[in-house]
Structures are given as C-alpha cells and as structure tokens.
Amino acid sequence: MTKEKNVILTARDIVVEFDVRDKVLTAIRGVSLELVEGEVLALVGESGSGKSVLTKTFTGMLEENGRIAQGSIDYRGQDLTALSSHKDWEQIRGAKIATIFQDPMTSLDPIKTIGSQITEVIVKHQGKTAKEAKELAIDYMNKVGIPDADRRFNEYPFQYSGGMRQRIVIAIALACRPDVLICDEPTTALDVTIQAQIIDLLKSLQNEYHFTTIFITHDLGVVASIADKVAVMYAGEIVEYGTVEEVFYDPRHPYTWSLLSSLPQLADDKGDLYSIPGTPPSLYTDLKGDAFALRSDYAMQIDFEQKAPQFSVSETHWAKTWLLHEDAPKVEKPAVIANLHDKIREKMGFAHLAD
C-alpha cells in the first residue's frame, strides 16, 4: 500500500487587503491550497502576483496596513487566522514555519557575530546550553558549506560574501528545526554560479531533514530543478496548479503558456526571447473575469465577463481557464513550448523532468 499523504497546512478562500492612501488594494483574491508534508511547493508568477504576501499570512508577517479580510488557514489543526499577538505568533514563526528571505542582510544583525546569532536561535528553540549551542552552531555552519567554521564563528556579517551570508541565514532557519521552510526568492540577489550552489544546498538539506518547503520564485528553471508541485499565481490568484511535470509538459492556462514561453533556454537562434505583452492589472480595482484576458491572445468574450472556475485536468492538476470548458474552441498552445519534454532534455538538463 502507498503511504497516504499528510496535508499539514490548508488555506481556504484567502483574501488579503491593504489600506493604501484611502484606497483598498486586494493583493490576494480567494486563494485556496494544501501543503503536503515533505513536498516542495513552488509559487511562481511575475512580481506583484501575490506570492510573498500569501506566505506572510502563514507567519503573521503582513505589514501593519494589511489584513486577512476573508478565509481560513489551518496548520496541523490550529487556525492561524485566529492568532493576533506577537506572543501567539512566537509559537509558530521560526519554530514551526521559518522563512529565508531574498536579501540575507535584512535577516542578519550587522553588529552581532555570526556565531551569536545562530546560538541564540538554538538556545531559544532547542533549549541547549551555551556550550552545546556553540557546538551545534558550528555543525550547522559546516552543513551549509561555510569553510573554516570554527574560526568564522566569531566573524560579523560584513566579513561574509552575499552567498555565504545566505548560507548563514539557511543555517539559522535549520537551527529553528522548522516543520515548514518558506524560501522567498532566496537566490535572486546572487550571481548565477552562487544561485546554483544555494539551490543544490537547499535540495540536499530538504532530502536530509524532510521539512516541507514553499519555494517562491519567478524563475521556472529553478522550479523545474527543485519542486514537486507548482502553483502559478497571477494578480493575487492561483490560476493553475499541478505536479511539476503536469505544469511543464501539459500546461493549460494561457498565463502558464506565456511564462513557459519566456524561459531563457527557449530563446530562438538569434537570441530573441519571448516577453509577455502588457502589464498586470491594477489591484485597486474589482477585477472582472480572467485578470489575464487583456494580455492574452487566447481570450474569449466570456473571459472579460466571468471568472473561470477550477477545471480539473487530473486528480492533481487544475486550471482556471474557460478554454477547458467543453464548449470552448480547441486551440493549440504556443509552438515554442510544444514538445517541451524534448527541449528540456536537449537544452535545459533538468534531470528529474527529463524522464
């Protein structure tokens, strides 16, 4: 018998609003998702699609002008939307759900040594003595690839490179022993070579510690190399969801087609790369129909009038597009992403997607 997958976090119909200059900006519009224990879920989409805002609702880190206006978030039987005080969130934030941010310098205290910042977390979350915490901290530093960790334990953040600082942030997250690790664009500020190293490190640690991961990115190349499931976000909604193989090889929403078409590895022989026309809609307005319709070559009249429901493609794959309605005209996805399986094998080398 196959082991039944354990859903550890369930978000239902989440709406997040921000008060901005006497207006209301709706950043998340009715998002629902389930997080399965041990899996890596990638949240992908353009900047402003709501990826980071959504995960902030899981850790109580919305800005002061933001609020969850609707919906529920169940984490292992606990309603996170009922938490209000900093003390309430202390039991969840870091201890159960930890976050690695894009810029490691926003996570590190510049006037404290690296070692003191790691040991502080170990003492708080693991209840170790100072001596035990130092030994563990050096062990974590070694695990994340810090050379000469014994000596560098007493150095300050400014003495570390950007890539090494990000490794320290990962070490601090590990020291919390989280159940869920949110990686919010953790490689964006790093050069390509260091990005690959950090991704490999996260994959290795995920395999060793078996924590559940939410990986936020706009880079589908990263998604292909690390994710089990993919949620494609646009204008505060999830418009397509499936396994990484389903989203890459059998995408159904026109926005997903556009994202895949813009993969740098799919540039033509002249080096020309597809870019999505237009700009995302204003989130201050009440969006009617499919928010992507104005930018889509495949939009039908109904896309401008009614929001599409979830159409199931398989037990694990769905998309919100009227193109999946039984009466919709049959259209072909863009030629550039046709036979994507072969192109991935030939040009992109994502091992777990190439089979």
UniProtKB/Swiss-Prot annotation:
**Which intervals hold domain ABC transporter?**
9-260
- Binding residue positions for ATP: 45-52
Superkingdom of the organism of origin: Bacteria
Q: To which protein family does this belong?
A: Belongs to the ABC transporter superfamily.
> Is Disulfide bond included in the keywords of this UniProt record?
no
Annotated gene: amiE
Pfam families in alphabetical order: ABC_tran (PF00005), oligo_HPY (PF08352)
Presence of the UniProt keyword Transmembrane helix in the record? no
Source organism of this protein record? Streptococcus pneumoniae (strain ATCC BAA-255 / R6)
Report the record's disulfide bonds.
none
What is the official name of this protein in its record?
Oligopeptide transport ATP-binding protein AmiE
- Where can this protein be found? Cell membrane
Q: Note the topology in the membrane.
A: Peripheral membrane protein
Q: Which PANTHER family match?
A: DIPEPTIDE TRANSPORT ATP-BINDING PROTEIN DPPD, OLIGOPEPTIDE TRANSPORT ATP-BINDING PROTEIN APPD
